[in-house]
């Protein structure tokens, strides 16, 4: 992950409050006053988002509008897409995600360690080559708590080191599964930022 300035305690608290699914009763209300003439545009918009910039990392929170009274709208944030805005922008990768396991279609664990994970790919470390003749592989990604996401891994590249194979793969997900994985990665992002905070 590219180096970016540490967040202040207030900024970190804001991030944690913006999206708090485990405690739905703890919500941050953000009031925005806009010109009433914009309402027709909001009703026609196919996409609305809140963007947070933290150094070279950009968080894009999808916004869902819920119509209330004629002069009032209620908006809800969904898990964000996290992008590292470097020379080649790409999805932010959660390093060494914990409690994750890949399973083969027969139910056996895939003999590979997930080195990092994004919402559209991952890097795997294994003692043996994962891809031989076929360039794709079907697996189940277990997120714990009985959450499993079916994936069709597409080989990007694989490299043989002295003792291990390092394999990069990509995948695409339907909306519901993508939201689930985005939520997991975002929580990992918040934990990673918390660990990087300087101690008092």
Residue ranges and their predicted role:
Residues 1-200:
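Structured alpha-helical
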């Amino acid at each position: 992950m590219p180096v970016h300035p540490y967040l202040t305690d207030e900024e970190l608290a804001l991030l944690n409050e913006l999206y708090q699914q485990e405690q739905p009763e703890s919500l941050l209300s953000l009031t925005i006053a806009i010109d009433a003439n914009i309402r027709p545009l909001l009703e026609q918009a196919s996409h609305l988002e809140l963007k947070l910039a933290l150094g070279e990392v950009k968080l894009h929170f999808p916004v869902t509008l819920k119509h209330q009274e004629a002069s009032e709208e209620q908006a809800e944030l969904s898990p964000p897409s996290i992008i590292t805005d470097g020379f080649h922008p790409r999805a932010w990768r959660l390093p060494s995600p914990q409690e994750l396991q890949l399973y083969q279609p027969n139910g056996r664990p895939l003999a590979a360690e997930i080195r990092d994970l994004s919402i559209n790919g991952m890097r795997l470390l294994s003692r043996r080559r994962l891809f031989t003749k076929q360039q794709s592989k079907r697996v189940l990604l277990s997120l714990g708590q009985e959450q499993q996401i079916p994936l069709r891994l597409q080989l990007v590249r694989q490299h043989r080191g002295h003792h291990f194979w390092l394999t990069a793969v990509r995948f695409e997900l339907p909306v519901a599964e993508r939201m689930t994985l985005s939520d997991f990665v975002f929580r990992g992002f918040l934990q990673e930022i918390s660990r990087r905070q300087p101690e008092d």
